[in-house]
């Protein structure tokens, strides 16, 4: 299978950039490289939220080093980076195969020993299970497991200190330990009787090259309480469990097998993305969120509404859409009333957020029916549109010309949100092109929806508003070259060629006629299209910077100045199919190949946040990004409708 990688494992330049991510619905995850060498401070075998400490994830178990012992000779399978490009103990040399079509599985060969290691992250609790199978051996074999503990937030590092507790208690077939107050106890158990040797030790100066690349601190010390030793026979499987509650060792085998049976294989582009889509769901008590990405993003309002249709409707999970919308609806209602949001959705006050919520509900209406959308969400849609028309939004001013004006001079208010020294890198302000495209689309969609529901008065009023808005949109944004200005504020017109003009070609309702739409599509195709997404700025525009590398400030300047983003390509493909219909299908399918190629690089089976805008278009940023996965899923679904 394409998910099986053999020859690249020995070469760390090939294997270290490839990461795997497994999550559960509570926000906990397991993330590392395919050779099990942690290269980010976010990496770990068991990383979990600790709500009584803060709103961050915490690395409890950083890694587990295995040693194969035969005839008194020890072969250590672990891998860590230390100072001066020094890797130790170089366990990757023994890897013969890595496969993650079903679950991440690594096969090691040490002399006559063949050992298979398979990892699974349990769906309904914070627990990782690792199954070791001795496929072949010619003499008595012992396994030794050495756990590296961190007990720290993903944003910080730990260093050798005297506060760390060295205490541990024996539990069935294992131990439990907790390094600091406020943390849950970590239970490490095997399904077979074993010896635990207490040998407390700090491993100093472990380095994370990805953090170094990004200009951050990059070294720490990890605590090893000792090691487990267990004999293993040819054909036998032993399971190691790490979790925050005790488990009966007798249950480990069946738990592992039940979890494996529950997984969708990553055997196609669609299945990879569908698996990835499930990873962004985050349930906390009654609330259901969508995380913007892994490993560092929380739930951001815009990202949630943009990605919701692709992550749920496009994989036929309408109930999941409704669950997330229930949480979002509470937040929207509180926001409209001027009360605290009351849940963990961030950036609710950005001016385009409510309009993206309308767009998400519009996709729901297309996937279910307008009647169902009206019955469930009609009042919410009317409240949103009324709130904006009554000029009650803090940063959306409805002008006489029907356009929405937003102030972004001092604060980044759109998805192009990078700031340096507190100032927006791109001060998009005034009439912003996608906000007004969203506005026109929302007016027309809600007008049609309420007219069908019998409210002709409101429908007429919204249509009249849309007429004014549409006319002004064309007058204000369209320039003599046939493309759209990115934003207009008084005499300030931004002529940069940016992807924000594509939305109005993609949306169901647009103020542009077909000729105007095609002109926009043409310039986007010529100047912004790459195999990995749309560039955020044309190479012909001033300030083009396609490489998202270096320390934070350098990256912030490049973030939306030429880097390519896959989610924009979703809207681009929708626009392309809107213009070319059936005859556009083969082009769109070819255009997806560049993203399908990503399934075996970066975060295996997912799409990273962004790419460099020039060849070789390297993946950058967060390893798995919700809007990207969602929009490509939405396009795959759209293509399947054309291909019926």
Feature roles, as predicted:
Residues 278-299, 337-356, 360, 364-367, ...:
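Carbohydrate-binding/catalytic loop surfaces
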Residues 275-283, 326-334, 597-604:
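Glycine-rich, acidic and aromatic/proline-enriched surface loops and short helix-turn segments
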Residues 250, 364-376, 445-461, 515, ...:
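Inter-helical turn/loop segments and adjacent helix faces that build the functional surface
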Residues 76-103, 110-112, 390, 522-532, ...:
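Non-catalytic C-terminal accessory modules of carbohydrate-active enzymes
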Residues 136-137, 158-161, 170, 232-234, ...:
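Aromatic-rich carbohydrate-recognition surfaces in CAZymes
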Residues 1, 6-265, 269, 295, ...:
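Terminal accessory carbohydrate-recognition/targeting modules of carbohydrate-active enzymes
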């Amino acid at each position: 299978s394409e998910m099986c990688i053999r020859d690249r494992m020995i070469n760390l330049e090939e294997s270290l950039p490839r990461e795997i991510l497994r999550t559960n619905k509570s926000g906990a995850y397991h993330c590392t490289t395919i050779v099990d060498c942690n290269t980010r401070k976010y990496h770990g075998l068991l990383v979990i939220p600790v709500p009584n400490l803060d709103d961050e994830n915490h690395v409890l178990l950083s890694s587990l080093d295995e040693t194969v012992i035969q005839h008194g000779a020890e072969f250590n399978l672990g891998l860590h980076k230390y100072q001066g490009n020094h890797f130790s103990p170089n366990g990757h040399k023994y890897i013969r195969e890595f496969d993650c079509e079903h679950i991440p599985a690594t096969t090691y060969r040490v002399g006559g020993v063949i050992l298979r290691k398979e990892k699974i992250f349990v769906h309904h609790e914070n627990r990782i299970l690792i199954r070791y199978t001795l496929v072949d051996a010619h003499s008595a074999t012992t396994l030794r497991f050495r756990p590296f503990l961190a007990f720290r937030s993903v944003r910080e590092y730990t260093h050798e200190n005297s506060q760390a507790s060295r205490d541990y208690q024996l539990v069935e077939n294992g131990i439990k330990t907790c390094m600091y107050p406020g943390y849950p106890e970590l239970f490490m158990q095997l399904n077979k009787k074993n010896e635990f040797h207490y040998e407390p030790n700090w491993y100093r100066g472990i380095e994370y090259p990805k953090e170094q690349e990004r200009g951050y601190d990059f070294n720490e010390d990890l605590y090893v309480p000792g090691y487990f030793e267990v004999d293993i026979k040819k054909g036998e499987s032993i399971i190691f469990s790490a979790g925050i509650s005790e488990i009966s060792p007798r249950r480990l085998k069946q738990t592992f097998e039940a979890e494996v049976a529950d997984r969708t294989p990553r055997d196609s582009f669609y299945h990879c993305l569908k698996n990835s889509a499930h990873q962004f769901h985050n349930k906390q008590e009654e609330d259901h969120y969508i995380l913007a990405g892994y490993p560092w993003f929380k739930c951001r309002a815009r990202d949630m509404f943009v990605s919701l249709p692709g992550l749920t409707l496009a994989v036929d999970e309408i109930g999941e859409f409704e669950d997330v919308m229930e949480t979002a609806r509470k937040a929207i209602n509180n926001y409209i009333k001027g009360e605290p949001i009351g849940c963990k959705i961030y950036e609710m006050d950005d001016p385009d957020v409510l309009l993206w919520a309308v767009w998400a509900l519009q996709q729901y209406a297309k996937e279910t029916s307008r009647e169902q959308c009206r019955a469930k969400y009609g009042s919410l849609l009317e409240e949103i549109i009324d709130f904006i028309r009554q000029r009650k939004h803090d940063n959306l001013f409805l002008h006489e010309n029907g356009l929405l004006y937003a102030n972004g001079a001092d604060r980044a208010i759109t998805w192009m949100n990078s700031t340096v020294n507190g100032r927006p890198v791109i001060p998009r302000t005034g009439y912003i092109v996608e906000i007004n495209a969203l506005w026109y689309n929302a007016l027309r969609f809600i007008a049609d929806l309420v007219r069908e529901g019998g409210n002709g008065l409101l429908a007429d009023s919204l249509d009249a508003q849309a007429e004014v808005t549409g006319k002004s949109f064309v007058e204000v944004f369209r320039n003599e070259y046939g493309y759209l200005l990115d934003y207009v504020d008084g005499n300030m017109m931004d002529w940069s060629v940016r992807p924000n003009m594509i939305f109005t070609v993609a949306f169901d309702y647009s103020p542009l006629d077909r000729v105007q739409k095609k002109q926009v599509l043409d310039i986007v195709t010529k100047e912004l299209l790459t195999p990995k997404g749309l560039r955020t700025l044309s190479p012909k525009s001033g300030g083009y910077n396609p490489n998202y590398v270096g320390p934070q400030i350098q990256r912030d300047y490049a973030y939306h100045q030429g880097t390519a983003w896959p989610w924009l390509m979703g809207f681009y493909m929708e626009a392309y199919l809107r213009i070319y219909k059936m005859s556009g299908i083969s082009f769109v399918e070819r255009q997806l190949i560049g993203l399908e190629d990503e399934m075996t690089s970066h975060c295996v089976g997912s799409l990273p946040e962004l790419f460099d805008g020039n060849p070789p278009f390297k993946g950058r940023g967060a390893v798995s990004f919700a809007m990207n996965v969602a929009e490509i899923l939405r396009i795959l679904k759209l293509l399947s409708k054309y291909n019926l």
